[in-house]
């Protein structure tokens, strides 16, 4: 039964000693102690450090193999935008949406569209559905 327990990872060196300004150190420092004993907190910090290093290495690998990271890219774009520009954009967008959300009735549809043969405004016909394009299964 003793082999079922997951062994603790071997951590060689400390991240704090290698680079005290690294982003992982900042994330490690915000780990709350809550009601853990100092020994439990030390073990939790070590395990969290292993997780952060693994996550950081995986993110670096994904970034180099698959291009830019979307989350990092979006955060960079948001940082470059001014807060006043964001509020102005949201106000203009809400005004644009409120004017464009009026639903046209059938009477406002141009007569050139309603008089076209084969044009169905009521909905898709059965020949246009995806199910009709499927091949029958062989038995």
From Swiss-Prot:
Is the keyword Transmembrane helix in the record? no
Q: Which Gene Ontology terms of cellular component type are present?
A: host cell nucleus; viral capsid
Subcellular location per UniProt equals: Virion; Host nucleus
Report the superkingdom from the record: Viruses
* Keywords from the named record: Capsid protein, Host nucleus, Virion
Looking at the Swiss-Prot or TrEMBL record, what is one Pfam family this protein matches?
Herpes_capsid
Q: Where is the composition biased (Low complexity)?
A: 100-120
Give a GO biological-process term.
Answer: viral process
* Annotated stretches, region: Disordered: 100-139
Give the transmembrane region(s).
none
Q: Which InterPro entries match?
A: Herpes_capsid
Can you tell me which family this protein belongs to?
Belongs to the herpesviridae small capsomere-interacting protein family.
Q: What's this chain's function? A: Participates in the assembly of the infectious particles by decorating the outer surface of the capsid shell and thus forming a layer between the capsid and the tegument. Complexes composed of the major capsid protein and small capsomere-interacting protein/SCP assemble together in the host cytoplasm and are translocated to the nucleus, where they accumulate and participate in capsid assembly.
Q: How does it assemble?
A: Interacts with the major capsid protein/MCP.
* Protein name as annotated: Small capsomere-interacting protein
Write down the species. Answer: Saimiriine herpesvirus 2 (strain 11)
């Amino acid at each position: 039964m003793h082999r079922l327990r997951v062994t603790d990872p071997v951590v060689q060196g400390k991240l704090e000693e290698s680079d005290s300004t690294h982003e992982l150190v900042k994330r490690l420092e915000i780990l709350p102690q809550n009601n853990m004993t100092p020994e439990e907190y030390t073990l939790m910090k070590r395990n969290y450090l292993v997780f952060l290093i693994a996550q950081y290495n995986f993110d670096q690998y994904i970034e180099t193999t698959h291009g830019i990271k979307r989350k990092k890219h979006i955060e960079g774009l948001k940082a470059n935008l001014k807060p006043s520009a964001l509020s102005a954009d949201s106000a203009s967008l809400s005004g644009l949406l409120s004017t464009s959300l009026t639903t046209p009735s059938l009477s406002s549809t141009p007569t050139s569209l309603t008089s076209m043969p084969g044009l169905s405004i009521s909905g898709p016909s059965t020949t246009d559905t995806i199910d009709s394009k499927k091949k029958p299964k062989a038995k």
